[in-house]
Structure formats: C-alpha cells, structure tokens
C-alpha cells in the first residue's frame, strides 16, 4: 500500500514543526512547500537526516513549485504572515487573503482530492476564502483553531486543578479570536462539569473566569513573549491531530472551523464547532445545547467572523 502524501504549504515555524511531527509519527511522505527558495529544501533535508536518528522511514522533499504537491492526500496550509506584538489576527487580512488565493489555485490545479486544513489567520475568514479559491467540497476544507484554543483551555485547567490533562475535556466554540466562547458548562475535569468543580471547591469562580479570559487571549500571550512571531508547537500538534483523524478514519470529535449548513442556526460560513473528522472529511457536526448567555456570546463571535468575510469581499470581488 502506498504511503499517504502530506503537503505542507508554508515552511515557516509551524510548517517546519508539522514536517518534523509528521515524519516522527510516520503519517506519510512529506512535501514541504514555500515560495522562499532554499527554506523548504533545507528544513526537509534537516528532518530527513534526523529520521536516521529517530528511526522512521519517510520521504521528505522541499519544493517551490505547486506541481510537487500533486496527488496529496492532505494539505496543511500555514502560508502567510504571522502576528507580531500589538497586532490582532484581523490585521493580517489583506496580505493573507492574497496568499490564500495563490494557495487555493495551487491546490485546485494539483491536489483537488486532498483534505485541506487551514491554519493561516484570521482563521475563520481565511478558511472560507481558501475553500472558494480552491473549489474543493466544503467538507474537505476545514480550519484549525478550536483544537488549539481548547488545548490551551485544558492546560490552564490542569495547571489550576492539579489534574492530568488526559482527564480534562475542554471545548471552545466560535471564531478564532478574542470573542471565542470557552464552553464552561460542557467542559469537564474527571467527568465533572466545571461549575460542579467550583461548587466542590476545586477552584474559585474568579479563578475559572480568569482561565476563560486567558484562553481567549492565549495566542496574544505567546506573541507578546516571543516578540518576533506567534505560537507554532501547539498549532502544529493540533493540525496533526486533525490530519491523523482523517487519514486513519478515526472519527474523532474535534472543535474546528467548519462550514455550517443550518447547524447552530447558521448557514454559509465557517466557524468553530465540534465536528467528527473521518475519511469523508468533516462528516458530522455536533450541536451543543446552549443557554441564553452562551447563545449571546456565540452570536457576538459569529458577527466578528461575518465582519471579516465582508472585508474579504470588499478586497476580492470573486468571493461570494
């Protein structure tokens, strides 16, 4: 049986980390693509040489031509400009929209059957635009955000409660921005919903509120510390989890930016919701029961996403 082919579009910090993880996990042969000559080739060679140490047999190739992604089973898109201190994800809109157009056209021409995971920010608008530019089925184009945001939520909860992250299930909904909605009632520690943990004295309501706010600002916290870029380890791990569920038909339920067709009362946009990822791509959306407060927060987050979509349409009239 032929090995899977994984095309990583963008050879920056996330792209290089993705290539390393994909090789170590033996997910498939890796094409690391970038427009910068030498960068993908150098990183691919470095990881290939490392494979002789960690003992995994995979092929890695750096490329500057979209023709090299031909026949890819999975494309993970990180191409674009990352955030710098003082920037919001939305500040990246104009330049990264142009990047998504080039990437979408490259995927359409050479890897039309791929499952596409977008990481480029502002995420919800970029994955929506990428799907239109590529013309791929909507269930085959998805955005990585909720897995990362939920992982941050889970880590902060583990830190506060002293419980293993393996026993924490945290969920975030909505857009990948400061208006995201950490789902407190639906997140659990050892099976106990977070409000019950507060009642039992595991953590105070003030501490929980602080964790929720830190989750919303989690990306900015890392940008401020790094000063020259944004997070890359956790985003890469998150995208690999999504790709693995697709390639191995695991049917994992993961929070991702997914195209909605009536779920949560919404149509014709991408926003973060729990979704079953299997061999068919985004196979089934899980709809949480939400109370009035959660509905209001989710609606606010969706309005932010819609605003970004309208801004994209103003820049590129081909988007509808």
Curated annotation (Swiss-Prot):
It comes from Caulobacter vibrioides (strain NA1000 / CB15N) (Caulobacter crescentus). The lineage of its organism: Bacteria, Pseudomonadati, Pseudomonadota, Alphaproteobacteria, Caulobacterales. NAD(+) binds at residues 10-15, 34, 96, 119-121. It comes from the Bacteria. Substrate binds at residues 83, 89, 121, 152. This is Malate dehydrogenase. Keywords: NAD, Oxidoreductase, Tricarboxylic acid cycle. The keyword NAD applies. Catalyzes the reversible oxidation of malate to oxaloacetate. Pfam families: Ldh_1_C, Ldh_1_N. It is an enzyme of class 1 (oxidoreductase). The gene is mdh. Its EC number is 1.1.1.37.
